[in-house]
């Protein structure tokens, strides 16, 4: 996946950094929540490779899994101080980055919330994620399909639902998507 645009003359912009409004070797920061999830490690590698291929200097950092959000806050502040033009953030806790995002706005740094919504601040320029509600719907349907496949083996079923981490704003969206599929079945007892 990549980004492109059109130049003033309508020509497709090239992939070098200068066409994006930054020097070809501008630093783009990427702050990810941890290295304990294969998804975040894969994303970090893809960011590193993509930024390098586009001519940018990538500064990809992971907050330690055992640490509080303070380490990610410090990493983001350092990226701003060190001159990052854009910072992509997979938030460790999307409700606790307001100070750093205000610092970014004051410095003219663009912020892209990646995969996890950043709340409690107006200083997010872009949000890039899957359709998390649809993901929840698919999770709910997968549960129903799995239970239907076992319907001859002791139905009805008792299920216990979990909505995810309270510091992940996407948890409620996943849960609501799943419940849009599950609640009608719960209500009618099927």
Q: Language-model segments: what does each one mean?
A:
Residues 3-190:
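A residue-level marker of the well-folded mature domains of exported/periplasmic proteins
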């Amino acid at each position: 996946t990549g980004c492109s645009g059109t130049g003033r003359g309508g020509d497709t912009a090239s992939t070098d950094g200068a066409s994006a409004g930054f020097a070809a070797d501008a630093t783009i920061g990427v702050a990810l929540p941890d290295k304990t999830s294969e998804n975040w490690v894969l994303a970090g590698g893809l960011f590193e490779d993509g930024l390098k291929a586009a001519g940018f200097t990538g500064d990809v950092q992971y907050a330690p899994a055992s640490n509080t959000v303070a380490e990610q806050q410090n990493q983001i502040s350092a990226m701003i101080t060190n001159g990052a033009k854009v910072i992509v953030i997979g938030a460790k806790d999307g409700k606790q980055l307001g100070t750093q995002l205000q610092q970014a706005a004051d410095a003219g740094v663009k912020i892209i919330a990646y995969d996890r919504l950043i709340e409690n601040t107006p200083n997010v320029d872009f949000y890039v994620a899957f359709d998390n509600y649809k993901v929840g719907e698919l999770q709910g349907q997968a549960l129903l399909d799995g239970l239907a496949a076992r319907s001859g083996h002791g139905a009805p079923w008792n299920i216990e639902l979990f909505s995810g981490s309270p510091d992940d704003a996407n948890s409620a969206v996943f849960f609501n998507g799943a419940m849009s599929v599950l609640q009608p079945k719960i209500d009618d007892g099927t």
